[in-house]
Amino acid sequence: MDRVYALYPRYDEKGLELIRSAYGIASVALKDMTRSNGQPFIEHPDAVARIAYEEIGLSAECIAAIYLHEASRFFPETDIASGKFGKDVYTIVDGLNKISTINPKDTRLEAENYKKLIVSYSRDPRVTILKIADRLEVMRSLDIFPKLSRERKVLETMMLYIPLAHQLGLYNIKSEMEDIYFRHADPEQ
């Protein structure tokens, strides 16, 4: 049994092949990258994909888009346009890549304007949902980040991602992000 089938048994063979191809591209592109804790960076899209699959129930196209987004975000020259992924996947990757270029600190946007910008860059609602799944993974991994980065991520989550999760009906994710926020915002409690 292969790794992709073991992780995503609900998908048909076409979906599994899509994920295998995307994972293959990402694992090559990200092979030398590590997270703040020294672990391979590929663990981040793996964890986001598990959230998207297990907790939200998104399609194989969304799982493939997670891997392709991470590969093309860091390495724009990564060839994901070979035609085998389809328009849906490319639309999602494009939306995720556009959102990743927005930095609320740089643009000095108010939270509401930033949320509107995220939604406007996400012509497809799956893009926003995947961005929330990504943020949940970041929140679950907060301890690997330096203190200032952690504080910024916690604040962004409270101001931006928790309200978005609520608006989209992702109540379990919203609640978990709130719990993590309160643990980190006021660790004495």
Language-model regions: role of each:
Residues 1-189:
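Active-site helical microenvironments for divalent-metal-assisted chemistry
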